[in-house]
Amino acid sequence: MKKLTFALSLGLMTCFAYAEKAPIRLSEGPSNAGRSYSKIYITSNVDSVVIKKILVNRGNCKDAEYRPWKPIRLNFGNTYTRLFTGKSPGVPCNVIEVAVDTNQGVWTFDFNP
């Protein structure tokens, strides 16, 4: 039984050691566009990554940019910013969760207040 427990523990530790690291770093902050807007900053941690889609608060915040969304390629160290607001006019977007769909998978980031 001890051997089985040890083998299982070793296997789990190996899985954690090889867990993938997100190809992007994400942060959020206030916008100079007004209190109703939140700004998302996405920075590449890898040589090249394509951002396909950004989903804020499981779709409860909407994209507030005037230009339509299109996928964007980021090289290592480059940062892309995007504005989001609440779904109703004048309602702010309090960013709690952001899911970013990339060419290297979907990555979810949590912001605990």
Predicted regions, residues:
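Elongated, acidic membrane-bridging lipid-handling scaffolds
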Residues: 77, 98-100
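Intrinsically disordered, low-complexity Pro/Gly/Ser/Thr-rich segments with frequent PxxP/GP/PP motifs
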Residues: 62-93
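A short, compositionally biased
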Residues: 35-36, 91-96
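Positively charged n-region of N-terminal signal peptides that target proteins for export
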Residues: 1-4
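Edge beta-strands of extracellular beta-sandwich domains
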Residues: 97, 104-113
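Hydrophobic h-region of N-terminal signal peptides that target proteins for export
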Residues: 10-17
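A short, sequence-level motif marking secondary-structure junctions
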Residues: 55-58, 87-88, 111-113
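Short, surface-exposed binding/anchoring microloops in extracellular/periplasmic proteins
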Residues: 22-60
